[in-house]
């Protein structure tokens, strides 16, 4: 097993980076990164199958058949794939099948890009939490392949999420939960039998929540839910047959939130 570990710390004006360690035996690669500080750039590229960018524990599951799954824990010392700081740039590219990536970002003005090419890959991203908001962060996710899954959870304000499934990408799952004011979510999907869940929660702010879905394909299941005290905007354009689309908006908490079910 190849292992790659990076520990990056920025304390005041001092920048310390641990050595990259790679052992050349065959098998899955594991990357576990902990970064503390501002204005850093992390670029990770994995080619092959069953590779892992690690951290933030394991679990998730759903089904019947709102699908999901995940159950990754592996990379360590003690798990990692975290960023604490602002104005950082993270780029993850995974090419292959059955890869996984989990990241937790706390801070503002960070940029996260995930590019997944292959089948049966799983990616989970968290920005902010109940004690730390993530402000003005940008998330860009691109999927090319089948049966992939991406989960994004964001707490904070003025965050943007953009997900693209390229032509011929089928049976994928995207779940965006944004507990934030002034959130923008954009989905561009070309493929069939995909599941998309988008939920925007919290006071919408003067500009409101915004969600744009552009769907080309058949048998896709799309559920969007927005709640907040101010304006919300949903722009939905679909081309194809047998798609199921659920749109719910409310000025208060949505009772019994729905989940997209596979067609």
Regions found by a protein language model. Give the residues of each.
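Long, low-complexity, polar and repeat-rich extracellular regions
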Residues: 1-263
């Amino acid at each position: 097993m190849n292992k790659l570990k990076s520990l990056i710390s920025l304390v005041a004006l001092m920048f310390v980076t641990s050595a990259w360690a790679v052992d050349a035996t065959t098998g899955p690669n594991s990357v576990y990164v902990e970064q503390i500080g501002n204005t850093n750039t992390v670029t990770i590229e994995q080619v092959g199958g069953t590779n892992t960018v690690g951290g933030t524990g394991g679990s998730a599951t759903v089904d019947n058949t709102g699908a999901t799954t995940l159950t990754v824990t592996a990379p360590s010392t003690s798990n990692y794939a975290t960023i604490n700081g602002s104005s950082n740039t993270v780029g993850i590219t995974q090419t292959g099948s059955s890869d996984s990536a989990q990241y937790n970002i706390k801070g503002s003005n960070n940029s996260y890009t995930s590019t997944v090419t292959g089948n049966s890959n799983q990616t989970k991203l968290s920005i902010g939490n109940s004690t730390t908001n993530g402000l003005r962060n940008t998330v860009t996710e691109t999927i090319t392949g089948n049966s992939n899954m991406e989960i994004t959870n964001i707490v904070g304000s003025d965050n943007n999420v953009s997900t693209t499934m390229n032509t011929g990408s089928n049976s994928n799952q995207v779940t965006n939960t944004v507990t934030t004011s002034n959130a923008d979510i954009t989905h561009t999907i070309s493929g069939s039998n995909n599941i998309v869940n988008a939920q925007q929660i919290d006071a919408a702010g003067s500009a409101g929540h915004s969600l744009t879905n552009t769907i080309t394909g058949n048998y896709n299941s799309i559920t969007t839910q927005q709640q907040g005290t101010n304006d919300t905007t949903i722009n939905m354009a679909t081309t194809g047959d047998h798609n199921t689309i659920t749109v719910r908006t409310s000025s208060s908490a949505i009772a019994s939130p729905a989940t997209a079910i596979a067609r």
